[in-house]
Amino acid sequence: MKSLNIKLIGLGLLAAVGFSSCSDDFLREKQNFDQADPAIYNDYTGCLGRLSDCYALCLPNPGGGPNWQYPSYGASDDLSKCTEEYAGFGIFVNPLEELNTVSGIKEQPDYFQGADALNIRNNVWGLIRNINDAIIGIEGGTLSREEKDELVGQLYILRAWRYFLIWKWYGGVPIIKDCPPIEAESVTPRSTAKEVYEFMIDDLNTAATMLEPSTGAGQWRTGNNYARFSMATALALKNRIMAWWCSPLFNRSGDEARIQACYTAMKADLEKINAAGYGLYKPEGKGNTIKDWANMFNLMGAEDVEGLMIARFNTIQEGGVPDYSRNNPWEQKIRPKNTLGGGGITPSATLMGIFPMRDGGVNAAGAHFYSKLKQSSVEYDETVPFLHRDARFYRTYGFPGIQWTHSGTAMSEGTNNNPYEGGKYELWNYVWYLDPALVGDHTSSAVYGADNLLSSVHGLYLTKRSTGDKYLYNYVGAESGGQGFRYSYQSYMEIRYAELLLNLAEVAAGAGQLEEAVGYVKQIRQRAGYQETCTEAGYEYENFGLTEAASTDYGTCLAQILYERQIELAFEGKRFDDMRRWLLFDGGANFSSISGAPATWTLIGWGGNTCDFIGYKPFNGERRENIEWQVRPTIEEGVGGKDWAVGQWDNMPDPIAKHVFANGALDKSSGEIVAWTKDQTWAEFKSWRSGFVVELNARSLVNNPGNADKNTYADLERLATFYNTYLQAKMKRGDGLNADKTVDGMYITFLPRYYMLGFNQNTQTKNPKLLQTIGWEDYNGGQGTFDPLAE
């Protein structure tokens, strides 16, 4: 059996700042010990400190990842840039940089070892050892059985979580349940993917049993224990792992017995999770509004019925001794520069196009990828792509003309920077050029944005998981240092109830329960505002906008489920995992091309090609583009200025302002151009333009606007008249250029061996007895021989 050398030193303690039930005095006394005194395991507070230490090192963190410690969380990282979500080649799809240990242009990333093999707090196996040490210590202490179960149950979930993060990449990894001697000769065999799967499921079943008495009725959903791992957390993580185990990445034969067993277990677990008070967040008496869908990410305590695996944060500023700061950086990342945000994140135009239309069907952009889904009868216009879309579109993307308020103000006395008070902030990110010759250049980045965004502008912004008008941060304006949204305490949901339903839908479909599987998707759609039947003229649909064939054809059912995952879980760090699990880069048709691959790696289930089976166009060979809305060439040639001199509000670089002052402005009511009779000032220009703004924070947006008291769809139609008069959509080159812009026409290239990752050279050097995975080179350049899928 293959072996592993693990070299580790040290133990330490750190406060888990998200849990106020921990004693600050105790934590201050116990910090920075290299070894935990066994006596602490006879004291509940001491044991809680050990548990909190494990939480602090293992909880998901939107400020990190994807790396050995954290998964992707939805930003434009190396994994998300391998999907439809972002342009720019991520590490696994770059056609110019083939990955391999020795002969590759670039070495594969390390998700197995970690930053420092000799520091228990900075590597994978140190974190696992830390958890094992706490389990052994607490079980050997003098606490009551009830107290031990509450603490150890949480540790079992943490251990399963750590194993899941390496298992999903490497399949077969060492299983370590104790704390072996720390010495060079300490060797642990590498187990198979099946053995690791069974180990994780056993840990989670044990955790669920331990935690059911104290959390099975939802007791920890409120108070100081909110966000601690519970029975529901254990079952939710088990649900995710089972979905992976049933998918073709690990189930090449399409083993029906495996799928049926997982389906039975997952369905029983769902009943327990429901009984604990969890479900899709739908406020009683409010209908299904997209504002509520967006606010789902901002809830805490009893209101939060959606979050099943949660990381909490605070607004404490860093630098304290000890440092208890734990800030969620997401809001800072996604906000534009003229709010004192980090500048924003730019999603691709590709996924924007794939989003459903208002009748639930796909437009031409979506049909390019999904051939089995219902085609929309609603017109799609790339110039105004926000018209007639699935309601979730409007709380995922930020485009010119939306109101995106925040607390505080970024304005500074005597400057033109950041010209809005937070409660009135409007995103106007249309762009212009300095040179008319660049207006049609799809590769030029020499653009300037409105409202002093200037060269910091993005054509499209990501707004998903913004706190919106909940303001879960301590805003720091320019007068106080300008840190903006840095100190945010918004929680982060790694697993939420919607994913739970979609995981079960996948497996139910595989077990032949197509109607049941579609029923779970309908729940997601209904929460997003769809109805069983919509009769509004021009937007008629049945069946919540789903294709009827999903209830009778397995491939179509899977396509509908995976499509709903792509939309509902967009920009939450899940898409690359889904594409790997379902082999969507090439359908899994090329495993035989991997050097040394056994016959058992050949995909037999799903017709031997998952892409053909579900009607999805393989992602290999595709490109992603970006989008911007530029001032039309008929408006001052699409050309404006590059700066806005301090104190000169009336000397704006915006060509639209110059144009309307001289030629008249669009009237929001009549749609006609009328003479400009007001003062030619920034204040008057802003007031006029604000008449076209869509107030998404203040309005209820549903997919049947006939029932909405405030019709945001009508507001969007009015905004479209502004676009059609002053702006035009321009596709900007996303993929396809190298650093010196001499290579054109590059396309997504994901190699078959990337589905099951191999170890990089640094990992193998530190573990010379660790044999490489089939398809990857060892550190001597030889071919790997370890088969993680062997049983």
Model features per residue range: what roles?
Residues 22-23, 124-125, 199-201, 225, ...:
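Long, intrinsically disordered, low-complexity segments
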Residues 167-168, 172-174, 215, 244-253, ...:
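Short coil/turn linking the two alpha-helices of tandem helical-hairpin repeats
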Residues 43-52, 56-67, 90-170, 185-198, ...:
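Conserved, well-structured interaction surfaces
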